[in-house]
Amino acid sequence: MSDRWYVGVDVGGTTIKMAFLTTAGEIVDKWEIPTNKQDGGALITTNIADALDKRLSGHHKSKSDLIGIGLGAPGFIEMDTGFIYHAVNIGWRDFPLKDKLEEETKLPVIVDNDANIAALGEMWKGAGDGAKNMLLITLGTGVGGGIVANGNILHGVNGMAGEIGHITVIPEGGAPCNCGKTGCLETVASATGIARIATEGVTEHKESQLALDYDKHGVLTAKDVFSAADASDAFALSVVDHIAYYLGFAIANLANALNPEKIVIGGGVSKAGDTLLKPIKQHFEAYALPRVADGAEFRIATLGNDAGVIGGGWLVKQQENSMEKGNETE
């Protein structure tokens, strides 16, 4: 095994997660720095480079001990060039992220979407367990995802593949989505969507635990819904089944097209575990082709906040392997 390390970087709206990884994907060290949004995020690459230098010195290592940087970022990305067209939460617009970071660090940089690198991380070292055909669905404030086919992330013609949260599941009369459409999966299966559905129904279920929670706190959360469902509250169980129906329906349609080996559910909402997973699987099996359903295994994501940095390491590994194969054919 090489003594040199991969660098994984996961850029978020409030923090940037960073890690050194062995070539086997084990985290040697991990840390966070604040996301500096001043001047439209112009100083982020400098902050990353400075943080790398500082951390390297603590390990008595130098840049020559690093193989490259794999970075996940939000927003619309030109995958080949690492150019960020627009990342609302960061402030980047028409930002040459790959070029700037390579200039600052003097290391090769590979850039991909943050949801995609989380999928790669789970595939490599997490719930995907090495599966070369896998779906990752992240349920948090929004609904995101990544599609791994034959060991590679599907990007599509302009980087938009994997926008699972914007599959239309309610064609008419659905709630408005942040994307501008209505009835997207995100409007029902995100933490905010789950809370909205529960809140809209409490007036008709005044004896439920959720109605008591709402009267007490004036607000409901997805966590409240799953806690009440775990306590066998009938209304909460009906809300969970409602959102699981749409998730199972959407995932089945994806699976019928992609035939995945693993379907991994991640994000904060996935902490509900089997309370959510069991009804999703029931509805999935109702809409998936039997052979597709037989080949797919549902799993809860295991890497948590480490998925992105581990996936960043995989990007470097993948590029390193392709370069070695290229040299062999010359």
Swiss-Prot record:
Q: Which GO terms describe its biological process?
A: glycolytic process
* Gene Ontology MF terms in the entry: ATP binding; glucokinase activity
Enzyme class of the recorded protein, top EC level:
transferase
- State any GO CC term: cytoplasm
**Keyword Cytoplasm among record annotations:** yes
Which compartments does it reside in? Cytoplasm
Q: Provide the E.C. number(s) assigned to this enzyme.
A: 2.7.1.2
Q: Which keywords has UniProt assigned to this entry?
A: ATP-binding, Cytoplasm, Glycolysis, Kinase, Nucleotide-binding, Transferase
Q: Which reaction does it catalyse?
A: D-glucose + ATP = D-glucose 6-phosphate + ADP + H(+)
Q: Is Membrane set as a keyword in this record?
A: no
- State the family it belongs to: Belongs to the ROK (NagC/XylR) family.
Q: What is this protein called?
A: Glucokinase
Organism of origin: Halalkalibacterium halodurans (strain ATCC BAA-125 / DSM 18197 / FERM 7344 / JCM 9153 / C-125) (Bacillus halodurans)
